[in-house]
């Protein structure tokens, strides 16, 4: 049980004990350090702030340099927060969060941001059928069609599916099984796919179900 911040390396295939090829995703989960502990009496909620990776001090802003120095850790690439229940362990500022808290066969939830597709029409974004290909139609093949009534309701309903930005959404994939844990390399291998492109950051949290 636990949680950690990781970076998606990519997908591969590994063989299980039955010599079956299993599609897996490799996640580099470390090095992660606790940079701040937030409390209800001060910040209004309880959470651990965790950094990922190590980078040169001059690569981060002056305020963040002071923040990392106060915690006594090397500056990282990003900062995220985990609730006390998610990390499920007592940690002090400056302590390291490692992959050793995870076991093979354990189920985890992976949270990430999906790949951005840019501005997309309704056919690509929502799998609309488009207009008729005949009966004199010339420019309505990929159009959404009518989006609102006339006198009643005389408006477009909220949430009507239209063209817009596709992707770049927060996605959670639940109950992925851990296929392999490599503490010496800070790697976790999970079965199946996870959201986001390669080198994107993801949160790995033990599943409660």
UniProtKB/Swiss-Prot annotation:
Keywords noted in UniProt: Ribonucleoprotein, Ribosomal protein, RNA-binding, rRNA-binding
GO MF term (any one): structural constituent of ribosome
Region (Disordered) residue spans: 131-155
GO (cellular component) term, any one: cytosolic large ribosomal subunit
Coiled-coil regions listed in the entry: none
Protein family per UniProt: Belongs to the universal ribosomal protein uL3 family.
Function noted in UniProt: One of the primary rRNA binding proteins, it binds directly near the 3'-end of the 23S rRNA, where it nucleates assembly of the 50S subunit.
Protein name in the entry: Large ribosomal subunit protein uL3
Species name: Chlorobium chlorochromatii (strain CaD3)
Gene behind this protein: rplC
């Amino acid at each position: 049980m636990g949680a950690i911040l990781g970076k998606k390396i990519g997908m591969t295939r590994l063989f299980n004990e039955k010599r079956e090829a299993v599609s897996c995703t490799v996640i580099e989960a470390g090095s992660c350090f606790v940079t701040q502990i937030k409390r209800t009496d001060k910040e209004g909620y309880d959470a651990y702030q965790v950094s990922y990776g190590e980078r040169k001090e001059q690569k981060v802003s002056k305020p963040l340099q002071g923040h990392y120095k106060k915690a006594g850790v090397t500056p990282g690439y990003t900062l995220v927060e985990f609730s006390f229940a998610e990390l499920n362990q007592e940690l002090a500022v400056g302590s390291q969060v490692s992959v050793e808290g995870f076991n093979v066969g354990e189920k985890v939830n992976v949270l990430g941001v999906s790949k951005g597709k840019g501005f997309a029409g309704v056919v690509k974004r929502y799998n609309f059928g488009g207009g008729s290909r005949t009966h004199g139609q010339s420019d309505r093949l990929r159009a959404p069609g009518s989006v609102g009534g006339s006198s009643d309701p005389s408006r477009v309903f909220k949430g009507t599916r239209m063209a817009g930005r596709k992707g770049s959404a927060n996605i959670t994939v639940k109950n992925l099984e851990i296929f392999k844990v490599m503490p010496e390399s800070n790697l976790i291998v999970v079965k199946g796919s996870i959201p986001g492109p390669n080198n994107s950051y993801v949160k790995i949290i033990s599943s409660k179900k």
